[in-house]
Amino acid sequence: MPQEFEDARAVLQKIEDAGFDAFFVGGSVRDTLLNKPIHDVDIASSAYPAEIKHIFKKTVDTGIEHGTVMVIHDGEGYEVTTFRTESGYQDFRRPDQVTFVRSLKEDLMRRDFTINAFALKEDRTVIDIFDGLSDLEHKIIRAVGDPHERFHEDALRMMRAVRFASQLDFKIEAKTLKAIEENNMLLGKISVERILVEFEKMMLGSKPNRGLEDMLTTKLNEYCPGFKDRSKELDQLTKYPLKLLENPEQVWTMIAWSLKLTPQEVMPFLKQWKTSNDLIKNVSATLQVLSMDKNDQNERLALFNAGEANVVNAIRVAQILGMNREAWLDTYQNLQIKDTHEMAITGKELIQKGIIKPGPQMGQVLNRLKLMVINDELKNESLALLNAVNKLQKDD
């Protein structure tokens, strides 16, 4: 049993000593059975919220209307949720009604997939009502009960299925896969932000090609921003070793490349996905580098504008696409300056020396100096830069 569970066993024991049932549940149990590290400890109990609050001295009402109370034990917070049933999913995401129950089976019946429907007792006994252990052994993702019902309860579960296929390298069971295809339009009811989280996790999983293939097979992509009618382009992605992708910037650069987007088209495309402005800026810069011809005369400027992290991202995406662009990093690292602030002279100094007056001309001169330094046409030294300014003014 992982240390996180060992630390929380006393919480289960205290609930059981009070006459109630308590179990570890959810993905952490699955990951424990797969010998993977766990991230969250979720506890489910037959005790109602008021009863949990009576058992423990320190509690916080984190989601009491849904049956969740945080118990503070040894300075750690553990969320304890009452066994419950759910009904009415008008938004295809959250239940309209939650009913507290005393039955573990009724609670586990509302879980998404059999591999997530385990309960683990304090004595390490695994409760497996839906043959999840068999599915875990055979690497199968299968909906609990009727897959159509599960996806109508929460349409995001369809994206979770393809995400798990990628993260775990599991196969989606035939009826579950068919139900995803038949209910794919429900994904349109889910917020883009939630789809984004699942999609990025899928693309950064250990087998992203598998997840993406399942996504295209079930046509979930038709209900994702900017992916409608782009199955052919997205399918081309599955021909590349996507497991080499390391971060969201590389994921979206790879996608932008496959959709033949220009750096300028990246912003409206990613705005649909509601990604951060930083990610949009980085993907645009990375794509700008990636789009260069091998001996592009603006190569040094593009690398300077991109910055080291985006140059590294461009090299990785190029590698995935079968291109060797390792030289870009050497070129970048040998630039005299990596930032405008590193210029050996500033506009303020030029004004103080009476060499130039404030205004548009000063900005133009400084830009020309910067470009000359970036292209190694000029040393980034005060005297050399001052001489260059005088020469530029005479020429003008």
Curated annotation (Swiss-Prot):
It comes from the Bacteria. Keywords: ATP-binding, Magnesium, Metal-binding, Nucleotide-binding, Nucleotidyltransferase, RNA repair, RNA-binding, Transferase, tRNA processing. Signal peptide: none annotated. The keyword tRNA processing applies. Pfam families: PolyA_pol, PolyA_pol_RNAbd, tRNA_NucTran2_2. ATP binds at residues 27, 30, 111, 154, 157, 160, 163. Homodimer. PANTHER family: CCA TRNA NUCLEOTIDYLTRANSFERASE 1, MITOCHONDRIAL. Belongs to the tRNA nucleotidyltransferase/poly(A) polymerase family. Bacterial CCA-adding enzyme type 3 subfamily. This is CCA-adding enzyme. It comes from Pediococcus pentosaceus (strain ATCC 25745 / CCUG 21536 / LMG 10740 / 183-1w). The gene is cca.
